[in-house]
């Protein structure tokens, strides 16, 4: 799981609290598979932190990491929950099922999202970004007054259910492939942002 280290009281930053709570939960409730929590910096200047981390993984580590779950914007009271899947389409269906099972409205699409998950997909690790759109995220209006505990809880619940479902699966249900309809936009994205 990954997220960016941002200012601490805004939709851009509360993902850190969600990651900490997930970390605490899985410390007390271990999964069948190991789970790694990663905080990355410099997302806003070209995903520099996550790109460095992903590119510095050893070949053995790359083989062991089967999925990256990235949490981006979260907590806006008025907003929509989204998942962008940089992996095979079956992960879209898993997310739709888990969201429906948990009573969480979720828009799911396969593709790329300009967030840390793209750095992991770029090195061949399937990835998904969970985020919530709403007013003010990543702007000068990005303040704590936009946050609400119920909206934060939805992102936490979805990340928890997805991690538990996949982390405890007898056979991991998502293949290690990055499909071409994801790979090409990913290559285009990194070509456009190179040197920025």
List each language-model region with its residue ranges:
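His/Asp/Glu-rich mid-to-C-terminal helical/loop segments that flank catalytic regions of hydrolases
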Residues: 17-20, 24-27, 33-35, 136-196
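Residue-level recognition of short, well-ordered coil/turn positions
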Residues: 30-31, 61, 125, 148
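Glycine-centered flexibility motif
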Residues: 7-8, 49, 74-75, 169, ...
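Generic detector of bulky aromatic hydrophobic side chains
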Residues: 9, 18, 68, 96, ...
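Soluble non-cytosolic domains of exported or imported proteins
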Residues: 13-17, 44-48, 89, 114, ...
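Second-shell loop/turn segments in exported
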Residues: 3-12, 78-86, 105, 144-146
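Metal-dependent peptidase/peptidase-like ectodomains
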Residues: 40-135, 140
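Alpha-helical metal-binding/catalytic segments enriched in His/Glu/Asp
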Residues: 1-47, 159
């Amino acid at each position: 799981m990954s997220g960016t280290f941002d200012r601490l009281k805004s939709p851009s930053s509360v993902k850190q609290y969600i990651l900490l709570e997930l970390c605490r939960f899985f410390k007390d409730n271990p999964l069948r598979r190991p789970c790694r929590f990663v905080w990355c910096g410099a997302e806003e200047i070209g995903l520099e932190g996550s790109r460095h981390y992903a590119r510095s993984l050893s070949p053995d580590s790359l083989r062991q990491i089967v999925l990256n779950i990235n949490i981006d914007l979260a907590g806006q009271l008025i907003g929509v929950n989204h998942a962008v899947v940089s992996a095979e389409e079956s992960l879209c269906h898993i997310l739709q099922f888990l969201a429906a099972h948990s009573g969480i409205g979720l828009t799911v699409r396969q593709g790329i999202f300009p967030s840390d998950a793209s750095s992991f997909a770029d090195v061949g690790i399937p990835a998904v970004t969970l985020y919530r759109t709403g007013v003010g995220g990543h702007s000068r209006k990005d303040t704590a007054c936009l946050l609400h505990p119920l909206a934060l809880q939805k992102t936490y619940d979805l990340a928890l259910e997805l991690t538990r479902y996949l982390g405890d699966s007898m056979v991991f249900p998502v293949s290690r492939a990055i499909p071409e309809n994801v790979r090409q936009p990913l290559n285009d994205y990194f070509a456009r942002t190179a040197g920025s």
